[in-house]
Amino acid sequence: MSLSNNLSKILIIDFGSQFTQLIARRVRELGVFSEIVSHKKIKIAQITKDNIAGIILSGGPLNVYENDKFKFDKKILKLGIPILGICFGHQILSKLLGGKVKKSKHREFGLATINKVSNSTLTKNFFNKNNRSDVWMSHADQVSKMPKNFKIIASTKNSKLTIIENIKENFYGVQFHPEVTHTNKGKILLRNFVFLICKIKKNWSSKDQKLKLINEIKDQVGDNKVICGLSGGVDSSVVAQLLSKAIGKNLTCIFVNNGLLRKNEEIQVVNTFKKKLKINLIYVNAEKEFIRKLTNVSDPEKKRKIIGNLFIKIFERYANRIKNVKFLAQGTLYPDLIESKSVTGSQTSKIKSHHNVGGLPKRMKLKLVEPLKFLFKDEVRKLGLELNLSNDIISRHPFPGPGLAIRMPGIITNEKIKILKEADFYFIKALREHGLYDKIWQAYAALLPVKTVGVMGDNRTYEHICLLRAITSEDGMTADFFDFPKGFMQSISNQIINNIRGINRVVYDVTSKPPSTIELE
């Protein structure tokens, strides 16, 4: 595997962490180019001080005792390049340099407070006035003995060697995840590593990102025709605009109404893209086809794979009609990939199949074009601004490709779809009316697979439970529930129950991610 260009960069060696791309994204936010490569594929000949300013070793699901499952050339440690190990990266760096790692007596998952022990360039402005900082932990092993010439920078109650460093060799290890937003000043720590320790200068911007993606599309596609699966959301809209700039008239967008869209969504999408943006768009009404295939299916993985397969069949059907179409473009994002599979070939744990990743058929006639697959939602929104997309497209809440199918656990019926469309409509409408929509990362209504007893007008009811979910997030990797102002939940609960037949109870989901995912299925 060759590194992509001659820009001085931060190299991230991936050991399978769910957060690896988040590290790269944090470095890009600093205005510095970064690149990820699997620990299985990196070769020492590719790394020189001329093209690599610093190396970050990611976390991962392995442990350092599984020597047969990870590869790392120890010669990399002798190149004189600054190295930062994060979580598993911290442990493997310590072990390779002669330290010891063992299972923790007390595992640490979630928020933890670390205490400053010594000063360090790495932790400049990282601790508060009480010499503490809140960080996000996710580990069952810990470094129990430091390598020679290392010193302790910070500790927790359960982990003495939480931050360690060898300033002479420029080796640094942190047991927590500075890349996630829950680590209070994680961005400061990464900034210190990039600029104060690696001494690299800014060399990257969103404009560079746009031009890079357009050129990559041209290189991949050439003069061939491409169809783009358009949903009307920000992801597929940005992909469509990138393709339009890269290949012009060789692009045809296809919008499939799978019967699982939000209320009036198909009308809004067609009006926006066909009439306003003048994009070559084909509208396909496949409601009956999707609902028939999903009849009596309750398993969420099967739902996603049925939907993914059917989307591809429809795209291939229309590709044959257009003729000479070789590629299918879609708005896959990095969080989709890391919940479905490993991107770099490292041992990432699968969370669930996304319809456009793990849900795709193994034998596809069309080749995939996924220009956004290494980006996060907010990065895509910035890219949308660079592409001059309107704010109503850029600010839309995420909506999953399988649509309402994964917002009604259990068997899908036309009656449930109708009820859920109305509940979601009232919820989103209320958010807009109260000026809350743009303060929330994603909000939706779901229908739970149980009914409960209620009383309406002195009569007994036995109807569905509507679950409302609204979360705040920066990138979709971690999320917290939105704390609504007093009175809002009571108001929307009354609206839903009074206006929609079939619901007699409304609940609000206050679970964060992790442990939950944003969608129910």
From Swiss-Prot:
Keywords: ATP-binding, Glutamine amidotransferase, GMP biosynthesis, Ligase, Nucleotide-binding, Purine biosynthesis. Pfam families: GATase (PF00117), GMP_synt_C (PF00958), NAD_synthase (PF02540). GO terms for cellular component: cytosol. It is an enzyme of class 6 (ligase). GO terms for molecular function: ATP binding; GMP synthase activity. It comes from the Bacteria. The keyword ATP-binding applies. Residues 204-396 form the GMPS ATP-PPase domain. The active site is at residues 87, 177, 179. Its EC number is 6.3.5.2. Pathway: Purine metabolism; GMP biosynthesis; GMP from XMP (L-Gln route): step 1/1. Signal peptide: none annotated. It catalyses: XMP + L-glutamine + ATP + H2O = GMP + L-glutamate + AMP + diphosphate + 2 H(+). Catalyzes the synthesis of GMP from XMP. This is GMP synthase [glutamine-hydrolyzing]. It comes from Pelagibacter ubique (strain HTCC1062).
